[in-house]
């Protein structure tokens, strides 16, 4: 035990030994275990729990609190303060002079940290800030590593002199009536754990249930509980929940945020119905919610826990929809939409068309009769589809890799996912040490890099070939085809004949790209280079033909790692020794790409046109863009880093981040429109399997009788509405609303009219839902052979 009373400066108390142990000081032993054993044995000079019972357990005159409640029991006779020794034989007829109980003040030096190591904090034992709080308790709780500080800033400072009837003395009396449990508590992983929510409260532990009840009686009879706080706590022991008890089982509680996020989905309906652990709240929403909190009490492993109900109490004035879940567009999306006639129930046509195109390309296949040169299977890949025109047979090499290359879309038979295969024609791999570089490339995951998945050799194409497998991004196009496919864009840099004058100077929005788009590309390309260089590699493919554009502005660097394999030199001891030089070349290549984008022409990066290209950049773009291009293209004596251009990008990075987040908001809004469509389609599919079924269980009229007849009339109510003039009434919102009401089973009544208009049936949606579920389950049972 680490809590007790500090020794009094009185000589009588200092010299007296409790429970027949002469010379022991009036202070709890720090080494006294719960199994009633002490580290120092009989030679211990401090107070033990069983000795405390010898002092306090023989009195029969309880001290009463000012409120009239029972308190601790102490011996009646009083020993004179001036005596040096206590008569051990007559100890039962004597009472120790404890400072604070006889009107004396409790010295500040006597209030050690060990005094406040019990589980009760504050006057009322639950961290109430309404009465005196000792400074050392604040230090104790602040230095505690097991729980946060539970004190309130409004706590009053400690007064030097406390009378007998003061709150401090009353608290001292309350502690005297406590009996500390001697039962050793061990963790119980199988027990249900009650973890109270955090708040400005205390911890309750190491107490028996009987002592808790005795303490609560004295507690609620105290005058300090007569205020508003006490009125809220007294009726139902409604104590504010505190932090986790000291001896709670050492297992993750079921109320932990992480497991609840994985296993629990909030249900608005639970907020409207009171649970068995709570009572209805009659106050309005504007009233403090603390008055409606219900404190639950449970004992686990001998430890008593108090916790609040985790289910939110029902609040009057809050009504959630029970069937209609199509809210209007969020205002931050509605005001940024350029189109006023945006669809309400479905995603935008532009996004839908883009997704459909990606799906078409992903599922595309070829006719093997028309392309016999494409094998049906390569290694573990099948269903090859060329993504670019196949090279002619007489083609020798390409300007990028020095070999003939071709690109295919294929499906991996191991995971049934589409991949992009880049084939290097006629290459024979003679040194497998380069696989270490390939493994390093496979570990790089970046949003602006096409990830390399594997590399293998094959003869499926009729010759030795090296194949690189990358992630497949359907619908992507190269930067070359997007921005540099216009021959007229090079007119500004072509030489004029004698007597011809230069054409008009290209301008932004009149032949040149917007500067914001160029900065968006710079941010993405520099981010990709930063990740590659940090991994100790070099891109070496910073070229418009190897940069993919997905959507409007999304960039990805393609074909990474190919140069590292094709140019691998096995004679070098360190294969990455030349990487710093390649990284410097990446920065120059990035500068050429940015200059070509600024000129909107590849002719601008030629050496003879550099001066003219920089003049074009100076006239049309900001000085920051010009300085960035000059920095990347100018060779310097020191080693440069891609991080050096970050100050040049500056606040434009935040502009790109803002644009990306706004784009994400628009896509999420489009996704929200499609969330319920799958559910409604399943309802229609089930309804279609029931209606107009020709025969079931040898009954031709099965779909025309019983519950099925109601569903048939409901189908007419959904789709066959007519106006007063007899013309068809087509309203999609009516269909969606009725299906949602059917799925929810609302008690709303509708009238179903037969086709001959001789019968009118008034039913509720809940009745229709019951008929719908029973009928469909009957069909499912028959399909599974259970009927």
Swiss-Prot record:
List residue spans of C3H1-type Zn fingers.
Answer: 23-51
Question: Which region ranges are annotated with the description Pseudokinase domain?
Answer: 365-650
Q: Where is this region: Disordered?
A: 1-20, 131-162, 179-210, 226-291
GO terms in the biological process aspect are: mRNA processing; nuclear-transcribed mRNA poly(A) tail shortening; positive regulation of cytoplasmic mRNA processing body assembly
- The answer to whether UniProt assigns keyword Heme to this entry is no
- Span list, region Knob domain: 690-787
Polar residues bias: where? 265-290
Please classify the protein's predominant subcellular localization into one broad category. cytoplasm
**Cellular component GO terms, alphabetical:** P-body; PAN complex
Question: From the record, which residues define motif PABPC-interacting motif-2 (PAM-2)?
Answer: 185-200
Q: Name one GO molecular function term.
A: RNA binding
Would the keyword Hydrolase be found if you checked this record's keyword annotation?
Answer: no
Q: Name one Pfam family in it.
A: Pan3_PK
Residue ranges annotated as coiled coil are 651-689
Positions annotated to bind ATP = 422, 471-478, 545-546
The places in or outside the cell where this protein is found are:
Cytoplasm, P-body
For this UniProt record, give its keywords in alphabetical order, as a comma-separated list: ATP-binding, Coiled coil, Cytoplasm, Metal-binding, mRNA processing, Nucleotide-binding, Zinc, Zinc-finger
* Subunit note: Homodimer. Forms a heterotrimer with a catalytic subunit pan2 to form the poly(A)-nuclease (PAN) deadenylation complex. Interacts (via PAM-2 motif) with poly(A)-binding protein pabpc1 (via PABC domain), conferring substrate specificity of the enzyme complex. Interacts with the GW182 family proteins tnrc6a, tnrc6b and tnrc6c.
Give the matching PANTHER family: DEADENYLATION COMPLEX SUBUNIT PAN3, PAN2-PAN3 DEADENYLATION COMPLEX SUBUNIT PAN3
Q: What does this protein do?
A: Regulatory subunit of the poly(A)-nuclease (PAN) deadenylation complex, one of two cytoplasmic mRNA deadenylases involved in general and miRNA-mediated mRNA turnover. PAN specifically shortens poly(A) tails of RNA and the activity is stimulated by poly(A)-binding protein (PABP). PAN deadenylation is followed by rapid degradation of the shortened mRNA tails by the CCR4-NOT complex.
Comment on protein domains: The N-terminal zinc finger binds to poly(A) RNA.
* Protein name per Swiss-Prot or TrEMBL: PAN2-PAN3 deadenylation complex subunit pan3
Species: Xenopus tropicalis
What does UniProt list as this organism's lineage?
Eukaryota, Metazoa, Chordata, Craniata, Vertebrata
Gene (UniProt): pan3
């Amino acid at each position: 035990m680490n809590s007790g009373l500090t020794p009094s400066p009185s000589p009588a108390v200092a010299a007296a030994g409790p429970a027949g142990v002469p010379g022991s000081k009036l202070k709890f032993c720090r080494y006294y275990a719960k199994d009633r054993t002490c580290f120092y044995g009989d030679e211990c000079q401090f107070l033990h729990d069983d000795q405390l019972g010898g002092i306090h357990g023989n009195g029969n005159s309880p001290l009463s609190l000012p409120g009239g409640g029972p308190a601790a029991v102490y011996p009646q006779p009083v020993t004179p303060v001036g005596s040096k020794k206590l008569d051990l034989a007559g100890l039962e007829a004597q009472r120790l002079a404890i400072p604070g109980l006889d009107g004396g003040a409790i010295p500040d030096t006597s209030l050690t940290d060990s005094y406040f190591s019990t589980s009760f904090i504050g006057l009322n034992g639950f961290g109430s800030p309404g009465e005196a709080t000792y400074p050392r308790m604040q230090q104790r709780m602040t230095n505690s590593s097991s729980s946060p500080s539970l004190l309130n800033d409004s706590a009053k400072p400690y007064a030097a002199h406390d009378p007998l009837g003061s709150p401090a003395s009353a608290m001292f009396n309350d502690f005297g009536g406590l009996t500390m449990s001697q039962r050793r508590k061990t963790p119980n992983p199988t027990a249900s754990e009650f973890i109270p929510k955090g708040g400005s409260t205390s911890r309750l532990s190491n107490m028996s249930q009987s002592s808790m009840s005795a303490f609560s009686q004295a507690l609620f009879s105290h005058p300090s509980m007569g205020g508003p706080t006490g009125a809220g706590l007294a009726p139902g022991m409604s104590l504010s929940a505190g932090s986790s008890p000291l001896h709670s089982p050492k297992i993750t509680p079921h109320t932990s945020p992480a497991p609840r996020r994985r296993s629990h989905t909030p249900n608005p309906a639970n907020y409207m119905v009171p649970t068995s652990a709570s009572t209805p709240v009659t106050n309005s929403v504007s009233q403090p919610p603390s008055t409606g909190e219900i404190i639950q009490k449970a004992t686990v492993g001998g430890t008593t826990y108090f916790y609040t109900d985790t289910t939110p109490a029902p609040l009057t004035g809050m009504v959630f929809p029970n069937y209609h879940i199509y809210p209007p567009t969020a205002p931050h999306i509605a005001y940024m939409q350029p189109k006023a006639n945006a669809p309400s129930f479905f995603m935008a046509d532009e996004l839908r068309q883009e997704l459909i195109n990606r799906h078409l390309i992903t599922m595309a296949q070829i006719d093997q009769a028309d392309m016999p040169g494409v094998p049906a299977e390569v290694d573990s890949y099948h269903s090859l589809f060329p993504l670019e025109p196949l090279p002619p047979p007489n083609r020798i090499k390409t300007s990028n890799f020095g070999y003939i290359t071709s690109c295919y879309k294929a499906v991996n038979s191991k995971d049934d996912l589409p991949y992009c295969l880049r084939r290097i024609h006629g290459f024979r791999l003679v040194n497998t040490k380069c696989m270490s570089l390939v493994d390093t490339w496979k570990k790089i995951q970046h949003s602006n890099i096409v990830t390399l998945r594997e590399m293998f050799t094959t003869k499926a194409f009729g010759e030795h070939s090296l194949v690189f497998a990358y992630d497949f991004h359907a619908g992507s196009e190269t930067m070359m085809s997007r921005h540099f496919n216009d021959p007229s864009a090079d007119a500004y840099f072509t030489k004029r004949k004698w007597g011809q004058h230069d054409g008009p100077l290209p301008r932004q929005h009149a032949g040149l790209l917007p500067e914001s788009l160029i900065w968006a590309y710079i941010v993405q390309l520099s981010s990709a280079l930063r990740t590659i260089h940090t991994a100790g590699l070099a891109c070496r493919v910073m070229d418009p033909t190897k940069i993919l554009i997905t959507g409007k502005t999304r960039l990805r660097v393609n074909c990474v790692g190919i140069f590292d394999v094709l140019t691998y030199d096995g004679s070098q001891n360190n294969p990455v020794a030349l990487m710093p030089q390649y990284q410097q070349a990446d920065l120059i290549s990035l500068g050429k790409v940015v200059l070509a984008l600024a000129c909107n022409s590849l002719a601008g990066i030629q050496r003879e046109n550099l001066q003219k290209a920089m003049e074009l950049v100076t006239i049309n773009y900001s000085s920051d863009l010009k300085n960035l291009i000059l920095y990347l293209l100018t060779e310097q004596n020191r080693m440069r880093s891609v991080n050096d251009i970050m100050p040049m990008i500056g606040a434009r990075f935040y502009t790109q981040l803002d644009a990306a987040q706004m784009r994400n908001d628009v896509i999420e809004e489009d996704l929200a429109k499609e969330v319920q469509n799958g559910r409604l389609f399943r309802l229609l599919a089930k309804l279609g399997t029931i209606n107009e079924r020709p025969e079931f269980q040898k009954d031709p009229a099965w779909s025309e009788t019983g519950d099925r007849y109601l569903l048939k009339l409901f189908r007419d109510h959904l789709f066959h509405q007519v106006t007063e003039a007899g013309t068809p009434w087509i309203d999609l919102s009516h269909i969606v609303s009725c299906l949602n009401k059917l799925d929810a089973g609302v008690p709303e009544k509708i009238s179903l009219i037969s086709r001959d208009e001789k019968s009118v049936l008034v039913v509720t949606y809940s009745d229709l839902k019951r008929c719908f579920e029973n009928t469909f389950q009957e069909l499912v049972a028959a399909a599974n052979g259970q009927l």
